[in-house]
Amino acid sequence: MAALRQPQVAELLAEARRAFREEFGAEPELAVSAPGRVNLIGEHTDYNQGLVLPMALELMTVLVGSPRKDGLVSLLTTSEGADEPQRLQFPLPTAQRSLEPGTPRWANYVKGVIQYYPAAPLPGFSAVVVSSVPLGGGLSSSASLEVATYTFLQQLCPDSGTIAARAQVCQQAEHSFAGMPCGIMDQFISLMGQKGHALLIDCRSLETSLVPLSDPKLAVLITNSNVRHSLASSEYPVRRRQCEEVARALGKESLREVQLEELEAARDLVSKEGFRRARHVVGEIRRTAQAAAALRRGDYRAFGRLMVESHRSLRDDYEVSCPELDQLVEAALAVPGVYGSRMTGGGFGGCTVTLLEASAAPHAMRHIQEHYGGTATFYLSQAADGAKVLCL
């Protein structure tokens, strides 16, 4: 059992250029890339103004294209799993006519970024999207596409915004055009990732801190359950609303301002379910701070213990895990050399992330597959750089 080979940026770029030539009859003039991400710890805390600790992945979206003079946007994707149609054309938004979300769903992420892009005037353009980020796997294929789109638009019409402002435009696109009230972590790490580092993000102040993650004896294993339960999209807004209700009941702007002791003392002010949801978030923010400190001092065992605590809290208090994810985590934890494992992403399917000794990775993948009822896909990734302009 081996990890799925990840196409390198040169391969994705070659595929995108080939598709562009076939579709538009010319070479593209511009090319950009933006990575997916895995969140090592800090789950469902970003929209509660908490702490998160993601790293950018070597899985990425590549977008190539050229400006055009007719005010139209013409798009093609070759991404596996993207809904039909894989090509479409639409006019740029105007003061009188905004873009609207529709079908195909994959194009809504592009449309949203175009709609909220702050600089003008944008020309029309033709573009091809190629991605190695699995769709629906909890590795931020959506943020990767949003950030790639934003980075491409910058080449057509430069902006003057901060990185935080760029992340917020991409986040707004996902809120309004994909109907997902996500936090800002995914867009931030796709923009700001740095090779050999995880990124501790404070989602209240938007301050960031690089945390070294380049020990060659250490590996990060991502395991895709290849299941996606329908609860994923419907339950996410429910969890967010429950957290906001508890914060209001405690007279706080967000759960970031709540300590566990305060929450315990106010147990009677909130529903039992609301209390459990908030207990996860408040505890997870604390765990994330502790995990970043553990990683800085090279204490992988402490980091792993916090990952396991995080998973159990997501399973029992936040109730966003599922039997498949639990099975993957338990199988990983049975392998010598594994420090910790947890579900990552929104939940109800998608991926787990496991921190382990690099030498243990082959055995871990075999053991997990043997003890998993479904078919898992494995990715071994180093911490990668954020969005880039590529040379053609």
From Swiss-Prot:
The keyword Kinase is assigned to this record: yes
UniProt catalytic activity: alpha-D-galactose + ATP = alpha-D-galactose 1-phosphate + ADP + H(+)
Entry's Gene Ontology cellular component terms: cytoplasm; cytosol; extracellular exosome; membrane
Pfam family, one: GHMP_kinases_C
Transmembrane residue ranges: none
Keywords, comma-separated and alphabetical: ATP-binding, Carbohydrate metabolism, Cataract, Disease variant, Galactose metabolism, Kinase, Nucleotide-binding, Phosphoprotein, Transferase
Recorded metabolic or biological pathway in which this protein acts: Carbohydrate metabolism; galactose metabolism
GO BP annotations, alphabetical order: galactitol metabolic process; galactose catabolic process via UDP-galactose, Leloir pathway; galactose metabolic process; glycolytic process from galactose
Site (Transition state stabilizer): R37
Top-rank EC class of the record's enzyme: transferase
A GO term for molecular function: ATP binding
Positions of ATP binding: G136, G138, S140, S141
Domain of life: Eukaryota
Binding site for alpha-D-galactose: R37, E43, H44, D46, D186, Y236
Active site: D186 (proton acceptor)
PROSITE patterns: GALACTOKINASE, GHMP_KINASES_ATP
Gene3D superfamilies: 3.30.230.10, GHMP kinase, C-terminal domain
Enzyme Commission code: 2.7.1.6
Phosphoserine PTM positions: S230
NCBIfam families for this protein: gal_kin
Described purpose of this protein according to its UniProt entry: Catalyzes the transfer of a phosphate from ATP to alpha-D-galactose and participates in the first committed step in the catabolism of galactose.
UniProt record similarity statement: Belongs to the GHMP kinase family. GalK subfamily.
Illness: Galactosemia 2: A form of galactosemia, an inborn error of galactose metabolism typically manifesting in the neonatal period, after ingestion of galactose, with jaundice, hepatosplenomegaly, hepatocellular insufficiency, food intolerance, hypoglycemia, renal tubular dysfunction, muscle hypotonia, sepsis and cataract. GALAC2 inheritance is autosomal recessive.
Protein name: Galactokinase
Gene: GALK1
